[in-house]
Every structure is written in structure tokens, then in C-alpha cells.
């Protein structure tokens, strides 16, 4: 008597393949979540390092570095050059020439240097930019995923989206410096540095805009952001977080972006944050009332 060996039917085989596919998908999703969690933590540490360096600079100089210098009176320099020594980059700082513009050929070996602590691991690594700013004559600089914030744009006030603050200025300004004593809104309620990742490619809502590049990406240029999305609004208020990286707070982290506060802490600002709250966090002495639970 012959015993027939039971074989898989086609349907059973397809079911097994489908189950394996689902398991692989779940595994890949879990791996991606773990990787992103690690990236976000590394990004947080980068901003903590930047915040500490800025506070050390302040301790020595009794003020923060300017946002940029030389706009109207060259030579032209960005913000990061001022505190490179406090980021354990003394050798790089020593080779930087202050008597010429950052984009001068003599400074190219310095400003084209890729600095890991200025790159969020969730973004594409080792980007550089032939800067589109007409001031810099197309010179190349290594890009940064972080920037200081300059001010609340006047257009937000004029449009009625935010109330007129006592001052629209943030901590970093053109050709001038601020002190901790100037941050009367409170250091825990004022943003010092923030993510603006992915430059020079223009990104909107997690997608690259084909053929569109933006200026301001190199860490050595006037790498300041506004803290609001000027080129994309979401009624009834303009978009605040992760809407565009055109000089606005933008990251590749799901659900929000990291910012370094003036007290040295790092906060994760969530997508959907009220633009009025963000504006209050941008100003250093706007006299707005903000509580920690608001953000």
C-alpha cells in the first residue's frame, strides 16, 4: 500500500509567502524606527553641543556671537566661525582668515570642511553648496542642518497672524550681539538654535521640490532662519514646523523638529504647533506669556 506524501497546494504556498512578506515588512519597519530614534538622539546631542559652545563663548566674551557680520561693511562672515574654538575646532579656527570674506579662496579649505556636529544623521550626509547668494560669487561651502534664528518676520505681524511683540528680534542679529541679560522672555522660553535640514535642496512637507535650490546652506555664510514658513501657509495660520526648509525650522524627524533653547536644553517642537507660540519662542524680549505646556 502506497502512502502519498502530503504536498503544499498553490494556495498554501501563497499564504506562506504572504506571511513571510508581512513579517519582513514588520521587521523593516521596526529597524527603521530604531534607526530614526538613534538619529534623533544624535541630532539632539548635536544641538546640545552647539548650545554648550555658545554658552561657553558667552562666558568668555560676555555676549553671544553675532548672527552675521559684514553685510554692509565687508568682510562678510557667518555665525559658526565665531564659536568654532568652543566646538573643539581650534585648528580649523586658527586657519580661518577674518580679514577676507568667508567665501574668499583662502578660506575655501576651511569652509568646505564637513563638520559632523552640524549634520543631522536623518538628513543626507556631506552636502555642499555653491551658494546662490549673489554676495558670495558662487563659492562652495559645506552645509549645516542647524541655524540660529533671527526674528519674527514683519509680514506675520502685518497680516494679523501674530500680535506685535515688544521686539521681533531673536538672539542672533545682523552685525550685533545679544547677551543673556537681553533675554527677558526667559531662557527656557527662547530658541537659541534650530534644525533647518536638507539644504541646499528645497524641501516642502517631506518631499524635495525638483530643480529648486535655496541659498544659506553653508555653515560659514549668513546661516540664519526666520522660524516661520514664509512660502507655504496652512489656513487659518501659517505653518510652523517641518513645512519648508527655506530658512525655516525643518527636520526629517517624523512629527517635529529639535530646537536648542537658550537655557541649554533641547526641545522637540511638534508639527502643528501654533504659529503664535512659535513666534513667542523666537523673540527674546517680546513680552509674550508662554508656559512650558504650550510647546
Spans of model-derived segments:
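N-terminal single-pass transmembrane signal-anchor helix
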Residues: 4-39, 49
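Surface-exposed loop/linker segments characteristic of extracytoplasmic
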Residues: 22, 37-295
Amino acid at each position: 500500500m502506497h502512502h502519498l506524501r502530503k504536498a503544499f497546494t498553490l494556495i498554501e504556498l501563497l499564504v506562506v509567502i504572504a506571511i513571510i512578506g508581512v513579517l519582513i515588512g514588520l521587521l523593516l519597519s521596526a529597524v527603521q524606527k530604531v534607526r530614526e530614534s538613534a538619529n534623533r538622539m544624535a541630532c539632539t546631542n548635536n544641538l546640545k553641543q552647539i548650545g554648550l559652545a555658545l554658552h561657553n563663548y558667552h562666558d568668555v566674551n560676555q555676549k553671544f556671537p553675532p548672527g552675521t557680520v559684514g553685510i554692509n561693511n565687508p568682510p562678510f562672515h557667518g555665525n559658526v566661525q565665531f564659536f568654532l574654538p568652543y566646538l573643539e575646532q581650534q585648528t580649523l579656527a586658527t586657519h580661518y582668515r577674518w580679514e577676507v570674506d568667508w567665501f574668499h579662496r583662502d578660506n575655501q579649505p576651511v569652509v568646505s570642511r564637513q563638520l559632523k556636529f552640524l549634520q543631522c544623521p536623518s538628513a543626507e550626509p556631506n552636502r555642499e553648496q555653491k551658494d546662490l547668494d549673489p554676495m558670495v560669487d558662487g563659492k562652495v561651502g559645506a552645509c549645516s542642518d542647524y541655524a540660529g534664528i533671527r526674528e519674527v518676520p514683519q509680514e506675520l505681524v502685518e497680516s494679523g497672524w501674530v500680535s506685535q511683540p515688544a521686539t521681533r528680534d531673536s538672539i542672533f542679529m545682523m552685525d550685533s550681539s545679544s547677551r543673556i541679560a537681553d533675554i527677558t522672555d526667559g531662557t527656557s522660553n527662547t530658541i537659541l538654535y534650530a534644525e533647518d535640514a536638507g539644504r541646499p535642496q528645497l524641501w516642502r512637507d517631506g518631499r524635495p521640490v525638483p530643480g529648486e535650490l535655496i541659498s544659506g546652506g553653508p555653515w560659514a555664510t549668513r546661516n540664519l532662519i526666520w522660524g516661520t514658513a514664509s512660502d507655504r501657509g496652512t489656513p487659518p495660520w501659517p505653518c510652523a514646523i517641518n513645512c519648508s526648509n527655506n530658512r525655516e525650522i525643518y527636520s526629517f524627524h517624523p512629527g517635529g523638529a529639535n530646537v536648542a533653547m537658550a537655557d541649554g536644553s533641547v526641545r522637540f517642537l511638534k508639527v502643528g504647533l501654533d504659529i503664535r507660540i512659535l513666534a513667542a519662542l523666537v523673540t527674546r524680549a517680546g513680552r509674550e506669556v508662554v508656559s512650558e505646556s504650550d510647546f
